[in-house]
Amino acid sequence: MFHLSRWLRLSEAFTRLNRPVVVVDLESTGGNLYQDRVTEIAFLRFENGRVEHYEQLINPGKPIPEFVVQLTGITNEMVAQAPAFDQIAPDLSLIHI
């Protein structure tokens, strides 16, 4: 999960760049592109001193391995009622990153 306070400390430096900066974080059930699925997507968008934040748990449609639970803190119970990725994908296209 995002550590928002850490990124907010950098917002002043990002502002000096005079362009938008987006930090994206994806969590998944593992590292295999063909077998594993996204469990969370989050981003921070810094522009003109403003910070936009988006964070969404995603139901991967498969169990999260215990080692991934230990690594990310995201449990099967947390994603059980979350939307599937294809349900949120259209919303992501509306985000101007």
Q: Model segments located where?
A:
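Conserved non-catalytic scaffold segment of RNase H-like nuclease domains
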Residues: 2-95
